């Protein structure tokens, strides 16, 4: 897959009504022919909900303040091409649309927490390098606490992960702040590194709900 397959970057739309930095009242998501596909607008400090996006974009309404689309590399003076399901749509560039590489976006904001009951095999195959070599496949089993992983890198269809040292987490029910996550990340560096295939072409192999936002309770 090449760099413009639409999964190498993430475009995040923000909702803010704070003074001069307030976001636009509307983000117009358009079809390739320029016709309107969806008007995403502010509704009482939240972005509007619509079934046209449900299950079709990477981040949809986890807090109502931002949505995130996989997108192509943006080009100056041109609309941003974003994925909605298997289709391409466009968004006009805005200071309130943040573009990150997929790797940076996932490393900064998310952990990978796979589903599974205690004693069950985790859903993906794990490898020591970004290559599906059957002879080197590693099977991991869910433990009593529930395994979680830091996302260390993304290379195309492969994601580099490392187990979270939950003993290093603060004993609190409050939101874990960035500085605290940095300490946990450092403590976790002694844990094994694995590679998993997070997508295959257009098919995402990880349930979106298994990408867990770091800064929520």
Language model region names:
Residues 1-35, 49-120, 133-136, 156, ...:
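Boundary regions of SH3-family modules and the immediately adjacent low-complexity/disordered segments
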């Amino acid at each position: 897959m090449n760099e413009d397959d639409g999964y190498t970057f993430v475009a995040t739309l923000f909702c803010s009504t704070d003074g001069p930095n307030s976001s636009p009242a509307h983000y117009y998501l358009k079809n390739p022919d320029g016709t309107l596909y969806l008007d995403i607008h502010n509704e009482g400090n939240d972005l509007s909900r619509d079934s046209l996006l449900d299950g079709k974009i990477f981040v949809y309404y986890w807090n109502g303040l931002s949505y995130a689309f996989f997108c192509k590399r943006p080009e100056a003076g041109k609309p941003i091409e974003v994925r909605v399901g298997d289709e391409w749509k466009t968004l006009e560039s805005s200071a309130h649309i943040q573009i990150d590489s997929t790797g940076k976006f996932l490393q900064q904001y998310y952990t990978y927490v796979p589903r599974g009951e205690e004693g069950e095999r985790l859903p993906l195959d794990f490898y020591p390098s970004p290559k599906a070599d059957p002879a080197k496949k590693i099977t991991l089993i869910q433990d009593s606490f529930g395994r979680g992983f830091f996302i260390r890198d993304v290379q195309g269809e492969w994601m580099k992960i490392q187990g979270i040292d939950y003993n290093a987490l603060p004993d609190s029910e409050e939101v874990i702040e960035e500085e605290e996550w940095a300490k946990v990340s450092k403590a976790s560096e002694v844990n094994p590194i694995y590679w998993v295939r997070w997508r295959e072409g257009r098919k995402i192999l990880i349930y979106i709900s298994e990408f867990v936002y770091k800064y929520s309770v």
